[in-house]
A protein has these predicted regions:
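Conserved N-terminal beta-strand and adjoining loop/helix that marks the start
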Residues: 2-23, 42, 73
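Short beta-strand micro-motifs in enzyme catalytic cores
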Residues: 10, 34, 82-86
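Conserved hydrophobic "DFG−1" position in protein kinase catalytic cores
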Residues: 16-17, 24, 88-90, 108
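Conserved Nudix-box catalytic region and its N-terminal flanking loop in Nudix hydrolases
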Residues: 17-59, 63
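Nudix hydrolase/Nudix homology domain
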Residues: 31-36, 100-136
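A short coil-to-beta-strand element that immediately follows conserved catalytic motifs
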Residues: 63-72
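Active-site-adjacent beta-strand/loop module that shapes the phosphate/pyrophosphate-binding cleft
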Residues: 74-96, 107, 122-129, 133
Length: 136
């Protein structure tokens, strides 16, 4: 059995709240139970988790964001990959499927709808951040 946290690059996810909703994307190819998730992708050599979150958001959704703060890191319970989560603020653009090879949908999700998109729950620091930023 291989240790995926060292064999594969870390993944950085962007947590973007706008107008009381959080941006989620649906992967064209599911990763186990993982279908809807935050914009995310591999951290490239020489890149910080925050820089990767900003880059991946632009590549996947066409939305320009700025990193606000790193919320935390963990080994994802469903994928075994090392994940970093960065809170980001939108700067310009409109979220859309910009990379049709990777995504097939984007959605701005209200606080109460999150369990419908992520039924297995969120990483606690991400949930806490969303609880503070979004009306229940």
């Amino acid at each position: 059995m291989t240790d995926q946290t060292t064999d594969q690059p870390g993944i950085s996810a962007a947590i973007i709240v706008q107008d009381g909703r959080v941006l989620m994307v649906r992967r064209r190819v599911r990763e186990g139970q993982l279908s809807w998730q935050f914009p995310a992708g591999a951290i490239e050599l020489g890149e910080s988790a925050e820089q990767a979150a900003v880059r991946e958001t632009l590549e996947e959704t066409g939305l320009t964001v700025e990193a606000v703060k790193l919320l935390g890191e963990r080994v994802h319970p469903k994928t075994g990959r090392l994940m970093s989560y960065t809170a980001c603020s939108p700067i310009s653009g409109t979220a859309r499927v910009a990379d049709a090879d990777e995504l097939d949908a984007v959605a701005w999700v209200a606080h109460g709808e999150i369990p419908e998109y992520v039924p297995y729950g969120l990483f606690e620091p991400v949930q806490t951040y969303l609880d503070e930023k979004m009306p229940a």
